[in-house]
C-alpha cells in the first residue's frame, strides 16, 4: 500500500460551508481508543500539557500514542529526550512510497512506553499542514499501529482553526483547550470553540473542557466558562519545575518529587488523565461574539 499526497478535496460540506480537509472513511481511528485533540493559543503550553498528559496516561497503565501536528516538530521531545524525524521528512526520503517504510522509521518510543510521532509539515507558506496530519494517520493505519492503542493525543499547532489544522478534530472524541487567565488566550479559546461547533455537526468530536495553564488565578477563565458552558478540567500554576523540565528535555514525571511543586503537578496530571478515562460528559458550549468577549473580560 502506498501513501500518495494528492490535493485535498474542496467539497463544501463541513461547518459553515468553508473549504476543509475531509476525513477519508478508511482513516477512522478504531473504536475503543480515547482520542484527544489539544488546542490553544500559540505558546500557551500545549506541547508541555500534551506530553505530561501522555506520561500520566502511561502511568495509569494505558498504551499511549502522541502525534505532534506542528511543522516545528517539537511536541514530543520531552518524552523521547530528542528531536525525532518527521513523517513528511521520512516519506520524502522514499519518494512517498510508504510501503518501503518500517514502523521504527517514524514511530519512536518515549518515556514509560509512550509512542511518539511528529507529522511535520510543508515549508512555511506552502501546502496544508492539516493534510499532512491526515497522511500521518493513514500511514499509522497502514502499519496497524493504532490497533493496540488505548489513548491517542493530537498536539495541534497554535490556535489555527482553518480546515487543515482542524483536521485532528475529525478523529477526536474530545478536545481540550489550553489557556491562561488572560484576554488573548481566552479570545483564542473562543475561536477554537467555534471550530469545534462546526466540526461537531459532522464528526464525533466534543468539547472535553479547559486546562488552565501558567495561571495563579482563574477568575477570567471562570467568567468565560460560566457564559459559554465550558468547565476547567485542570489548573496548573506557574511552577518553575515545569519550565525546568522543558530545559532538561523530560516530562514532569521525571523530575524529583522533592522539588517545590513537582508532586502537586504530577497529581494534577494524573487526575486529569483519570477523569478523561472516566468518560467525561461532553460539553455543549456556545461561543461568544468578539465584542461580547471584549465586554465580558477585565476588571470593573
Swiss-Prot record:
What GO biological process term is on the record, naming one? light-independent chlorophyll biosynthetic process
Q: Which SUPFAM superfamilies match?
A: P-loop containing nucleoside triphosphate hydrolases (SSF52540)
Record-linked CDD domains: Bchl-like (cd02032)
List the catalysed reactions: chlorophyllide a + oxidized 2[4Fe-4S]-[ferredoxin] + 2 ADP + 2 phosphate = protochlorophyllide a + reduced 2[4Fe-4S]-[ferredoxin] + 2 ATP + 2 H2O
Residues that coordinate or bind ATP: 43-48, 72, 213-214
Which family is this protein grouped under?
Answer: Belongs to the NifH/BchL/ChlL family.
Under which name does UniProt file this protein? Light-independent protochlorophyllide reductase iron-sulfur ATP-binding protein
Organism for this UniProt entry: Synechococcus sp. (strain RCC307)
Gene name tied to this protein: chlL
